[in-house]
Amino acid sequence: MRFSPTLCLLLSACLFAAQPNVVLIMSDDMGWADLGCYGSKVNPTPNIDRLSSEGLRFTSFYATQAVCTASRTALMTGCYPNRLGLGGIALGPGSKIGLSNDEQTLGTLLRHAGYHTGVIGKWHLGDAPKFLPPAHGFDDSMILPYSNDMWPLGYVMGDETRRKMYPELPRYVNGHQIGYVKDWIDMDALTSAQGLRAMKFIHDSAGKDKPFFLYLATSMPHVPLGASSDFKGKHATPFADTMADIDRAVGAVLKALRDKDVEKDTVVIFTSDNGPWLNFGRHAGSAGPFREGKGTTFEGGVRVPCIIKWPGVVKPGRTTDALAANIDFVPTLLEACGGTKPKNAIDGRSFLPLLKGDKDSGREAFTYFYGDKLEAVRQGRWKLHLPHAYRSYVDMIPAKQDGLPATTHQRQIGLSLFDLDADQGETNDVAAAHPEVVKELQELAASERKKLDAGKRPVGRL
């Protein structure tokens, strides 16, 4: 059977119209309460707040693990990171492991679906060439291979004391090293540089014969904080200065979509990789009503902001308390964009019906891993903590200087049940009053643990 050229063009146009552009923005160490639309009275975030008013705001959205590499592995693959050997990890310079090339990332899967793909900002899935973005489905990239604190200087702006444990912090464009973040001037300019590159990607990609996928992973507000001179010292805290800088970059990205007349054809997502690193004081964010922060399985560590705008699909100004997590982005976006399922099994579930107006996300439960240890499970209002040790930010020993980390404590929690509807702060253990709930959640935890153990796959190695 042969089709006329005109029909082929029409079919191509229909396919393209059905494939929205995607802009996925993920900040670093931004807490649940660090945006105006989530209650912050300190951080000026008008552009992100407007995005919320034009889209869907999640109040029970989770990072799959509360640390850099692990969370990014989940976002890129739709898998629990410990399934892939990257649980509880923040990979450093010269790491011998990374995300396996046998895994299909969101970049790979959307490129297979016909997308032009780009990543800008913090990568953190391995710094060897075989682990960098070109090997994982990205046509265009400008990245730092790991966190901005993994450099020779310290946490405090202006400190020139060099740390021998870290080499210079390299910059990569399309897999090739092009220089370094060499000083505090470069650190201050980091957010602006990432925002400008994102604008360029949109201007170069919009209106072409392919839809585009842009993954913008800002290095900030991870310490050491940087901010442009337009914001530095202008707000109540250094963290607020940095948040203002991030918000401007987000605003620039949104303006680029409008300028190229593709706003109505683009899904925009904003989220964070984990909760705030609370021992950095005025240089850290806020978890709001939630307990603890980064590196823990309490709500403050893993519950993060998430906003999704999709004109014509997502009703503006909605708020949902439906459960969802960053492992759900892969199946959701593949369904929305006409992609095919990954060759390997994943853990995420599509919440596309929720975006289209349903109240249910399709996720009834969430399991909280840290490293390879299952530490808690949530089903509906109930959250059961299994016995585990954790890093606590309560009653920290203060640092000698603002901007340096306070000393945390190691604490233990026993088998504990919390009603998150009545007790967001996880302070009132009601396990004794609800033994049937404890038993049900213990059985769920055992089942989830067994399923994950049965399907582990090798980490990438040099």
Language-model-detected regions and their locations in the chain:
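Formylglycine-dependent sulfatase
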Residues: 2, 11-416, 424-443, 447-462
